[in-house]
Amino acid sequence: MSELKISPELLQISPEVQDALKNKKPVVALESTIISHGMPFPQNAQTAIEVEETIRKQGPVPATIAIIGGVMKVGLSKEEIELLGREGHNVTKVSRRDLPFVVAAGKNGATTVASTMIIAALAGIKVFATGGIGGVHRGAEHTFDISADLQELANTNVTVVCAGAKSILDLGLTTEYLETFGVPLIGYQTKALPAFFCRTSSFDVSIRLDSASEIARAMAVKWQSGLNGGLVVANPIPEQFAMPEESINAAIDQAVAEAEEQGVIGKESTPFLLARVAELTGGDSLKSNIQLVFNNAILASEIAKEYQRLVG
């Protein structure tokens, strides 16, 4: 996918990221939906800038991805990050389906896990850090509400480092879906699937790996064997920032019930649920969300360095 020639009018890679790719330095992709739809301003922009700095301190180059004025951008300026933060929900949330239309219309777009993977792959970036992946929504057996992130993971060669699937989802059905499509679900130093705000859940990952080098080797073997598709690395939230299971589950259950009552569906459901859970937990879930992103950025940096060492 990285060999596809794409017009610079459609895809622009920042000089810093371009230099890293050209000189075979490690790069970590970051998404932008977390900026515009995942947190309130100014915390969203501040967090995004701090996550970039965290990655730089580890050695790799960060590449925040978004659509600005109809251009797919890999590596944003601080001004562009602040624009996405300020505009918030006025910025279109862009998954695979929406991407060509937002670009064609010359609009701004915040990329989800799926569209960030697509653009990262176009640029030749193999490692991506986020908060949590989308998945199968609760009640999907009736609504068929399944995030496009999962299909992207089945098809696109990018490793996604996350704190598991967002705990507002049906974790059991999400793991089943990933298994059906052959997506490895790796637990980093854990056999239990992390549940975003909580370190564990009642579900298991498909394999436990304990080091970034083991993960990098698995990536290289998978793709060199012609096994296309991504890998999910589920990295538990640090213990000191994890939320008590009982209180977070009560908040999630209430938020899900309210979403159903208000008819919130589709791509609006995740931002609604995360915002409502933050309100119901007095902002504690937002603090946890920010910390788990930092934690994932650090692990993604280690994996990117190890992978670059392996493939040269």
Residue ranges and their predicted role:
Residues L227-N295:
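A C-terminal functional module that forms or caps the active site or interfaces directly
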Residues V28-L30, P62-I67, V103, G109, ...:
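General beta-strand structural signal in soluble alpha/beta enzymes
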Residues C198-Q224:
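Anionic-ligand binding region
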Residues S32, H37-M39, A45-F101, Q224-Q240, ...:
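Glycine-rich nucleotide/cofactor/substrate-binding loop typically near the N-terminus or early
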Residues M1-K57:
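N-terminal glycine-/serine-/threonine-rich phosphate-binding loop
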Residues A110-T112, E141-A154, V158-E179, A212-R217:
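Active-site glycine-rich loop that binds ribose-phosphate moieties when present
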Residues D19-K22, V27-V28, K57, I119-L122, ...:
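Solvent-exposed alpha-helices and their adjacent loops that cap or buttress functional pockets
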Residues P42-A48, E80-G85, G135-A154, Y177:
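A glycine- and small-aliphatic-rich helix-loop capping segment at beta-alpha/alpha-beta transitions
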